């Protein structure tokens, strides 16, 4: 399933929300690739834009092109290695916000559905109980909405426990509440409701690659401005980077 047209937003060119000698955090807009695609016309990306000013910048995790929000990048090889290892051992925690179709009745819950690539229709993913990889998402209703025409939507707070490709999008579809604006997984009426995928990476906790102390970074959500820092209300990690020898292998 090829990308038909790529016109990423350019204003602002980059939106840096935090920087020190080791890491850089940026608010990626919806519609911009995290890293360059295979074709020359898909070179423009969050990484390539930052590389213009930071030649040694390294990507340690990615967001889908259609997803907006927080990306943390490494400014040197040592920081890159340290952060990638944290993602590998699942020491990082994330909070996303999404506007989904319909009213979600449960106030909160857990979606535990294994996912696998839908190869004939890649990059789509699908639920597969036989061969899928374990995938778990916690969700919580933040706000139920009703538009003037009677259309019902819900703002949900999403806490991915695993980090599979398209996990949040497929899990919300499986729950019967696809994310609005999702060209891959939404119903037609949910897809045309918004010009963009309303999925935003709002908060990330990690251990600083130099000090090894726990910290978090937050970026506001454009479609849910009420969002606020709360990652440590849901997760209670150790305050100092644990010894990897004491952790189970990923």
From Swiss-Prot:
Its EC number is 5.4.99.28, 5.4.99.29. One of its GO terms (biological process) is tRNA processing. It comes from the Bacteria. GO terms for molecular function: 23S rRNA pseudouridine(746) synthase activity; RNA binding; tRNA pseudouridine(32) synthase activity. It catalyses: uridine(32) in tRNA = pseudouridine(32) in tRNA; uridine(746) in 23S rRNA = pseudouridine(746) in 23S rRNA. CDD domains: PseudoU_synth_RluA_like. Keywords: Isomerase, rRNA processing, tRNA processing. The active site is at 64. Gene3D superfamilies: Pseudouridine synthase (3.30.2350.10). It is an enzyme of class 5 (isomerase). InterPro entries: PsdUridine_synth_cat_dom_sf, PsdUridine_synth_RluA-like_CS, PsdUridine_synth_RluC/D, PsdUridine_synth_RsuA/RluA, RluA_PseudoU_synthase. Belongs to the pseudouridine synthase RluA family. Dual specificity enzyme that catalyzes the synthesis of pseudouridine from uracil-746 in 23S ribosomal RNA and from uracil-32 in the anticodon stem and loop of transfer RNAs. This is Dual-specificity RNA pseudouridine synthase RluA. It comes from Vibrio parahaemolyticus serotype O3:K6 (strain RIMD 2210633). The gene is rluA.
